[in-house]
């Protein structure tokens, strides 16, 4: 048995476990009141799309699942900006995703920003649309979720009206 391989798998398991423990509980957090107003904006100013939302992944020539996130090629050092008003619920370095920021926009809507070069916000901090939350690296992976369901970010960005939310009752 190759010990290097088993150590490598153990490291992957540790990174995945750390990610699950930090991020997955956010999927089930109770929704707070709506914090955004107007449209959502792309967190990167200058970018090229590397992996688009819904794009089919191909590994080893075999077709796989569809991407739940969007990966952008970005300019290192440029600001990564809050896509909408909200509260930072996670801002830390995770072994699997690097510097990670999660913003709760209310009503169960959250943005997950992975792979930043640096963080400039802290957990519990309120942020406004367009406010820098960190510095971009070579690429940014962004995932927008309503609860635990991923949302196509381009639909959020294409209108100034934003995501509409109707209160029950």
Where are these regions (language model features)?
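Short, small-residue-biased leader/transition segments that mark boundaries at the very start
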Residues: 2-13
């Amino acid at each position: 048995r190759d010990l290097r391989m088993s150590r490598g798998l153990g490291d992957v398991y540790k990174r995945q476990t750390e990610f699950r423990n930090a991020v997955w509980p956010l999927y089930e957090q109770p929704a707070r009141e709506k914090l955004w107003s107007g449209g959502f904006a792309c967190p990167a100013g200058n970018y090229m799309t590397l992996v688009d939302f819904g794009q089919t992944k191909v590994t080893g020539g075999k077709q796989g699942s569809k991407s739940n996130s969007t990966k952008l090629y970005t300019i290192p050092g440029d600001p990564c900006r809050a896509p909408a008003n909200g509260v930072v619920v996670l801002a830390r370095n995770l072994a699997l995703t690097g510097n990670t920021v999660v913003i709760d926009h209310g009503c169960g809507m959250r943005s997950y920003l992975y792979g930043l070069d640096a963080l400039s916000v802290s957990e519990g901090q309120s942020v406004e649309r367009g406010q820098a939350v960190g510095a971009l690296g070579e690429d940014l992976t962004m995932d927008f979720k309503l609860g635990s369901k991923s949302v196509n970010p381009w639909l959020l960005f294409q209108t100034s009206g934003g995501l509409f939310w109707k209160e029950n009752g």
